[in-house]
Structure formats: structure tokens, C-alpha cells
Amino acid sequence: MILKKIEEAYRSAIYTRADATKAIFYFSAEDFEGLEKASFVVRSQKGHRLQGYFYSYPNPKPNRLIVFEHGMGSGHRGYMKEIEVLARAGYLVYAYDHTGCMESGGEVTGGFSQSLMDLDDVLTALEKHEEYQNYDISVVGHSWGGFSTQNIMAIHPDLKNVVALSGFSSVKRMVSQHFSGMLKP
């Protein structure tokens, strides 16, 4: 019975959309004077529209790009303060919403593997784009985004840096560390 309830809770979090809620205040680029925002859409392997934006202040560091990976339950706007700090440090920052989140397409988030597939699609699109082909690309991710950030090097070994904030690299290991007794796999 307990395991069934846990499975239901997991499925309700993973197999649904994660859209804005009035319970959470989301900052926008307009809340930071001088922060520039430019739309850049990526088509996922599954055909979903991944809506993202480049954020920067005038004259960012040449050929340096940080891709920001958001956590579960929010889109990238839940991290606008962190994105702004990176932009203020002189970086061009690309932040997007995963499949099934906020401004991106998809009926459901699709779980942990979907975030990794989305990041692969984004990095592939950036690496193929004429303007960003010669950029040093780094990835910063939090929680769910930290999972994809830690695992993306297996697919894109040429990334300059990866930084995971409260991330985990193995779903099985994460579950075994945080659940005990009957709940332990």
C-alpha cells in the first residue's frame, strides 16, 4: 500500500506538466536593469519545442557560453537571480525550459532521462549553430538539472566545465541514499 502511494506520487510529479503557479513569484529579465534577453528555440528529438533565451549584459566575454539547467517543478525563470549573477559576471547565458515545463512543449516532463535528452538536444543545436560553433560551452545545473549536467559529459566530452548544484548522477543511488526500510529499493 505504501509503495503504491509512493509510486503514485512519483508518477504525478514526473508524468505531468510543470507550469507556472501563482504560489511562486518568478523574476524576469525586465526585473534586472540592462539585462538583455533574446529568444532561441530548439526542436527536441521527439519534436517538442524547447523554449529558451540568451541572457547577457552588453559586451559579454567573447566565445564563452553557459547553459543553465533548471530543477524539477519550475522552468528556468525560477533561477533568474542565478542566471543574472552569471550574466553580470560577463557570461552569455542560455537558459531554457525542459520538455513539459513552462514555455516548452510536451504534455509531460518525461522524467530524469528526458532532461538529459533535452540538454543533449540543446548542446547539439548550439554546437551546430554558426554563431556558437567556436564557443567554450559550460553547463550549470541544479537538482534535476544537476542530474543531466553530471551525465552530459558522456555525450558531450568537449564541454569546458560542468557545475552541479545539489545534483546526483545516479537515480538508483539517489533513491537508495534517501529512502530506508521498506522504501529502500
Model-derived segments and their meaning:
Residues M72-V85, H98:
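The serine-hydrolase catalytic nucleophile loop
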Residues M1-R43, Q51-Y53:
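An N-terminal hydrophobic leader/cap segment in hydrolases
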Residues E131-S143:
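Alpha/beta-hydrolase fold nucleophile elbow
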Residues L86-G105:
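Conserved alpha/beta-hydrolase
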Residues N151-P185:
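Hydrolase active-site cap/lid region
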Residues T109-E130:
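Alpha/beta-hydrolase active-site loop
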Residues G141-N151:
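Glycine-rich nucleophile elbow surrounding the catalytic serine of serine-hydrolase chemistry
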Residues P62-G71:
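Short beta-strand element of the alpha/beta-hydrolase
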